[in-house]
Amino acid sequence: MLNNKLLNQLLALTPLEEQQRRNQTFIEDLPQAAFDSKEKSSRTLTNYFFKNQDIYLSKHNRFAAYPNHKHTFFEINYVLQGQAKEVIAGKTVTLNQGDLILLDIGTSHSIQALGENDLLINILFQIIT
């Protein structure tokens, strides 16, 4: 069982989530340095997240669809609460509370808008060579 204090912190709206809920549109919160190209249709997230660390955790922003993208690292998406729908390599996948999915390097995917009570946790793993 998740600690109520932690759950309340995760459910609290961030300023970006407030904007996305109000505007019903995706707002980019990553700098251009996080991508290897300016192409919106084929954005690739780079190792931007891994400054002095090999694993990066974050709560996925709610209320707007996250555009199609891919990575130069592995990603696990874990549904802590509610539901998340992703389009992975052209196929729609529904994840429910407790589900997780491992996304390989270069896997194209997008995430449909999460609702008020949906919590998706992103766990990113840097590839060390």
Put a short name on every predicted segment.
Residues 1-80:
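Generic protein-terminus/edge-of-domain signal
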